[in-house]
Curated annotation (Swiss-Prot):
Protein name: Nonribosomal peptide synthetase ACTTS4
EC number: 6.3.2.-
Family membership: Belongs to the NRP synthetase family.
Domain annotation Carrier: ranges: 991-1067
Domain of life of the source: Eukaryota
Region annotation (Adenylation 1) ranges: 462-860
Keyword Ligase: yes
GO molecular function terms noted in the UniProt entry: ligase activity; phosphopantetheine binding
Annotated stretches, region: Condensation 1: 34-438
InterPro entries recorded: AA_adenyl_dom (IPR010071), ACP-like_sf (IPR036736), AMP-bd_C_sf (IPR045851), AMP-binding_CS (IPR020845), AMP-dep_synth/lig_dom (IPR000873), CAT-like_dom_sf (IPR023213), Condensatn (IPR001242), PKS_PP-bd (IPR020806)
Gene it is expressed from: ACTTS4
Amino acid sequence: MDDEIPPFSLVGRHVQDYIQQVAGESKVDPTLIENILPCTPWQARLLTTATEQHEGTLRAVLELGEDVGWSRFYAAWSKVVQAASILRTRIIKHDKYGVFQVIMKEDAAWKFSEATAKESDNQPVEGSFGQPLSTYAIVTDGDSRKFLWTMDRAMFDPHMIRRLTTMLSEAYHERAFAGLKGFDCFLKNLQDRDEAKYKAFWTMNLEGSNAFSFPTSPGPPEPTIVSRYESPWSLLPLVSPKLDSSNLVHASLAVVLGRYFGEGDIVFGALSSQRDTSLPDADMIMGPAMTEFPIRIQVVQDQPVASLLEAVALESLTRRPFEHTDVSEISNLNEDTQRGSTYQTLMLLHEAENCFQDDRSIGTWIDETAMMFGAHPLVLQCFLVDGRVKVVANYDQNVLRSREAEALAEALILVMRQIIEAEPSKKVKEIDCLTPSELERVWTWNAALPAPIESCVHTLIEQQSSRQPTALAVCAWDGNLTYGELESLSNRLAHYLARLDVGQGTVVPLLFEKSMWVQVAILAVLKVGCAFVLLDPSGTAGRRKHQLERVGGRIVLTSERYSDLALGAHHFAVAVGSHSASSWNALPVQGLTCPSPSSIAYVIFTSGSTGEPKGISVPHRSVSSSSKYHGIRAGVSPSSRVLQFASYTFDASVFEIITTLVFGGCVCVPSDQERLGDISRLITSMDVNVAFLVPSVSRVLEPSEVPSLKTLIIGGEPSTRTDLQRWAHLPTLINGYGPTECTVFSNMHNVDLSIWNHSTIGKAVGSSSWVVSQVDHTKLAQIGAIGELLIEGPILSHGYLRDPEKTSASFIQDPPWLLQGGCGYPGRRGKLYKTGDLVRYNDDGTLCFVRRKDEQVKIRGQRMELGEVEHYVRECVQGVVQAASEILLPAWENAKPVLAAFVTTIKSLNEEAKNLATYRISAMGLGIEESRKLAENLPEYMVPTVYFTISRMPITASGKIDRKKLRDLGAEFLTQQAIEQKNTKGLIQERSMGVTEQQIQQAWSRVLNIDSAFIGLDDNFFRLGGDSISTMSLVAELRKLKIHISIDDIFNQPTLRDLAGSVTAIAPHDEGRTGGSKKDEMSPQAFALSPMQELFFRLQTDPNICFDQCYLLGLEQRVSFEDVDRAFQTIIGRHAVLRTRFNRGMDGKWEQRIATSVSESYVFNSVTVSGDRECAQMISQARGKLNIMSGPLFAALLIEGTEEQRLFICIHHAVMDMVSWRILLRELEQLLLDGQLTVPPGMSFQEWCSLQDKHISESFAPVQAADDEKPKVPRGWELAPDVDGILRIESFVVDQRVSSKIMGMSNDALQTKPIELMLAALTSSFNLAFPDFQHPRIFVESHGREAWDNNIDVSRTVGWFTTLFPIQVYPGSSLLETISQTKDYLRGLPRRGWSYFASKFVTEQEKAAFVSKFPVDVTFNYVGMFQQLERTDSLFKTLSLPENCRPVSLPQSKRLGLFELEVSLEDGCIKVALLYPESANTKKEVELWMGNFKEAFAEIAHTLASV
């Protein structure tokens, strides 16, 4: 039967090595070796990882019948042994070849014993490496005889055992065996498989696996204590023939485990002996075809059960050909498969009661295989036989309690029944997993609901005042109050409020620092029938404004310190303090009419996911009930001195103040300074004996330094075992839990470290605690399963203030399980709060906190919605596409939780498109403005501590952000960063920046619109995208910070490190040189033109010709006409040059003067248009209104369209340049968003022109203008008279990859700047396209703001500063030579061409000679990138002008060059646009030129990369 596969052929060429190893280890004759075979991966894993010799050994007992003859039975079994070579197999372990199996030519080894069956069963197994692994014994015990068969677990599977016991029957009755197949057939099939396909399948199957392991080990590994639970057989409903048994079991287990995990990505192990159906007669293979592999099932709770079964069936069908890849092989493929292979639960399916084939004529088999399945913490065996089901659970008691194992087995059967009977529309979340026995226990814990305390809060406190009027009620830094004094003062203030018409039911805000007067104010508000809301006076104005608007009312009680705090037009402050008390000191001391216990006592605001805080309204009944119940549990009494440490916006302050007063204790109130100082000294000095602290605060205290403290309640955020061990000596140590919606505490747990789990929050206080399914609150969760905590009882708040929608979503009424009751407990009606916290029941009914269901978390005791944090990160941080925030816990000792923000940006997403295999994460810095905006919108504790850019957001299988992956990535990054900083001194130095360096880094970030995290000390400003125009913006930014840096400094020291070294502070006497005086601005006298203006007026003699610059801007948020108009008035009043009037003097020369009227210097209208044609017409008319002689020089339109609002601005070019546009738009945006400008104006253009004119006349000696001969124009270049008429446009875009090199790394080789590479590309490509044109006149435009005195600052000045200079570079023999020449020429120009241009305007003769050169052949203008319009948070976005919006006169404007090139940087790509006269007969050459120009960029990027 084994002839098809030659012996020894499966172990390769080294057969003799194998044989020698066998002979030496087994001490057998080599001739007795029948065959040597490799082991299956499953066998190899078991044989090399077994921890005990007996583990998994088959121990089968056959009770022989009285009539069975021994010799006949012996012969029959011997025949079986000879036919089934697996029974003659030994295992050899070779140092080089690993484990392999050897088939021996030998008979069965028998033993005979007179021991009892029990004694024999406990005998050690003899099998080991090199020894027989299948042994047999006849045991006699009195008159009974038993056949005992032991076999190593790696040598059998259930199918093979059934086949072998069938063969015993056939041999005993002398029937021929059916055609058997040797195990080598199966092994040969495994060897021949396509490994790549197997690896590819499992890699894909487990990609992104992030499943939690169940059951979860509670701590370090301990010796396994295996227990067994076996459910009774029970009937199942009739199963459809279409429903495969394995799919039913696997789907059911996935549902059950999904409820335990609280996750939809479920992975568990399966052990199968599935024969490969591609092999003929696979059922006859005699060998262990066992394999263990992971099964991954996505459980979507909202999907129909039928869909789940279809998905499981499809997964099973797809997986089946690849199941014989053992879990050990799968685990080693990658990280995902490794995670997917670390499951703790193993499932086996049996479709027979046991794996033996009984033959009553021989005897009865007793199954002894319970220990055969390995060391998983939970092994489930499901038996499906003849419509009946039984589940056997083998579990480790160190990991899983007996009740949990039993409940899980019963739940599996319960779910199977529901799946079988499910209607087509039934959803997975509707499946009930709670068994009747568990339901009874849950009701036992929650049957008795505490009675409400029907009393107002202040009534309970008044009772204490009556009992002990002289006892201290408040001991504060600013004074003490007895209960009698507190009662008297609060009553008088209540009467005062009543006289101010503060009506009952009003919510009265309180704005106080820590003070004894807070207690007075609280009680006064309650006594007048109102509710109080404590606000944080140090919080942001925006948040306070929202809260005041939310609660309504007019009166705000403040401390005398905050009585002048801005509250808005609809609120006014009433000060409460020692001085203001005289206003109400004479009022009655008797109380007022008590409101109903159902009326609101206080409102408290918590974080909201939409960016707006939620106000929670809490009635008197809830406060009284909660205070009474949790006060008793905490042991609060008249002798209690309770520290009032919590912020007033944290509901723990309610416990500290109200609960203390309700029980007659003393509220100990430190000052805000003391509270943030030495807390230990504070507690001791105030003799505090009761305190509530969040774990992070408790860690700063030394227990030995607070001997007065007797009771400590820790809560607000999860604590660690270490946190509590430090305080274990206290008489009372409590772990407290409670959502704000449930009035401070809903659960408390007296800590017992000997039995305590650090996440235990105890049992309910004043309430009942229910745990429901995470996705369906109409289903109770199993005991031990992760579910959402619901709280029922008198401590619940009313809900959210004036927000019924949110209230109904979080507070539910009468869930079906509450109405139904259960197991003898009657149902009831009730209101419950859905906490959003995931918990699970411990076995004793206490609760264990797991995590938040949504993104709401706590840090430093304060609750927040991560969604709110993410909302404002997106709003305030520029460039953010996606944002996610998480709490990180780095892996170093004593690490504190860190609030982190993860963002993707356009840049990171573009980079990620090239690499989808990994997540790249890096630290990110915020700009000063971004930090300011976050601080304005979020409380301090909600502002992230660390920011990361991530290449792409990790996604779970269900398509949601994988927050666990984010936490892992962030914590790993922080941990690794800490290690690097600790171990690498050089890195620490690299990362450490001084204050000046950090300021410059932030300025670079704002100007270049890139994250500061990407800017290092040795980064080059120009490599990061800087250009001559952005240097002006940088100078202006640094001036705001009182940092003096000139443009020359930036060009000469372009790295951050070097630039910081050149910094000098702005001297006080130099401030005047950076901003013009009012006198200069308003001077009506005419002043000189700038050189560029002079060139323009000499070329353009007709003043009526339109020569403007304009922008059409999209508005990201709507603005009013009035707001824009006010902004324009401010800007035109601020920049006098925009009020310029030009006129021609008697001598024919043009001059300029400043008009005083702002309103007559601009025209602004609002128009509504229906389409582009109408829009173009309106724009054309606006442009036509510009008049350089009478004004205005500024025109604008607010364009209202059907879908968006647009703003058009045009300004005459004679007073405007590209740097000026940046200044103007930045100021316009600030005015529209903030309503004011925070930076003073720069030097006036008038003063600049005067100073420049003086400097030119003094510094440049008149020279005879060179009568330059114009170059000979090639044939075909002769131009018609309308050279300044209709234009053609040619353009191209350089791809981002090449552009990024031109702007960055390509400059490293020759230390060039991007503009130098651009001009080299221009000159070389022009020469190729026009070989007959020798030495074209190419002029470069520059921003011209080159001050000869470093104290002159025109970085914030609007005007026309442009300069022109020629570039005289003749293409060399190579591209590198051309680049080198270009660089040398440009670097040799004094002041980047300004000196050349200025020198041409010294004398009339010089001016005339220079003007005669125009139009030149080519002008080149690099305008750079408009960073402020590319920010994602910019108010403006640039739009294209509609066609046909040019004024009629525009084609008549004079041009500076025949070919005008403009180069810009948009969205990371270099864009080149060429304008030239339509009359030029050069279209073919121009197209060739543009093609060469574009190729030159690519060639430069490639060439310089290899230098």
